[in-house]
Amino acid sequence: MIDQTAIIHDTAIVHESAVIGKGVEIGPFSVIGAEVEIGDNTWVGSHVVIKGPAKLGRGNKIFQHTSIGEDCQDKKYAGERTFLEIGDNNVFRENCTVHRGTIQDQSLTKVGSGNLFMVNVHVAHDCIIGDNCIFANNATLAGHVVIGDFVIFGGLSAIHQFGRVGSHAFIGGCAALNKDVPPYVMAAGNYAKPFGVNSEGLRRRGFSAEAISAVKRAYKEIFRSGKTVEEVLPVLTEMAATEPAVQLYVDFLKDNERGIIRA
């Protein structure tokens, strides 16, 4: 179903089962496949391919030569029915790729809202991405990666499959992540190491001086006390009782399986 207010270029191909919302624009030579739903006021540039099953929310902008919802690159994939969900107001610049999930996980790749994917960013199968993240040019996410909210990835950075990055973390350019990066942490290098708290990012997002100070104290417990994750969790849990910002650390470390980056 195509809403009557949608503007579709004569050279674009839209499958009869696709659902195209109000005010959507689809540019020249783009291909919208079966079981694709595109939310209101989304702009699709030229030479874009969107393959279903995939659901895109409102107000997204997808630039030329981007591929959304393609089959994954996992060699185990055998054509199973898997899915992609994308929220609202994301920007995908030129040549981005976002693949659907696999049955070995939850059969779903999921992207939140308000994210910016710069040129040549790759999001592999089964990734889960939160809201308001920035991925600079050529950032690469392997399969099954989980990214929190307000995370920034520098250009040419990459993360190993099943890796996690907590909310408000900052990943430097060309970083290679082979372990999890806890919330608030600045990480850089190959392999990446921690370089303190993303204080400037927290200030820009309205964190109080007291909250940032608590985050820094918790950071020192995690990375400078010599304690293991298991040993530091009770300390952080006690801190979180009076400092709510520390709870992000607690929740993240409770789910730690691959280990975290270390200096």
Swiss-Prot record:
Lipid metabolism in keyword set: yes
Chief place where the protein resides: cytoplasm
Cell compartments where the protein resides: Cytoplasm
Keywords noted in UniProt: Acyltransferase, Cytoplasm, Lipid A biosynthesis, Lipid biosynthesis, Lipid metabolism, Repeat, Transferase
Matching CDD domains: LbH_UDP-GlcNAc_AT (cd03351)
UniProt cross-references to InterPro entries, sorted A to Z: Acetyltransf_C, Acetyltransf_C_sf, Hexapep, Lipid_A_LpxA, Trimer_LpxA-like_sf
Family classification: Belongs to the transferase hexapeptide repeat family. LpxA subfamily.
Protein name (database record): Acyl-[acyl-carrier-protein]--UDP-N-acetylglucosamine O-acyltransferase
Species the sequence originates in: Aeromonas salmonicida (strain A449)
Gene that this sequence comes from: lpxA
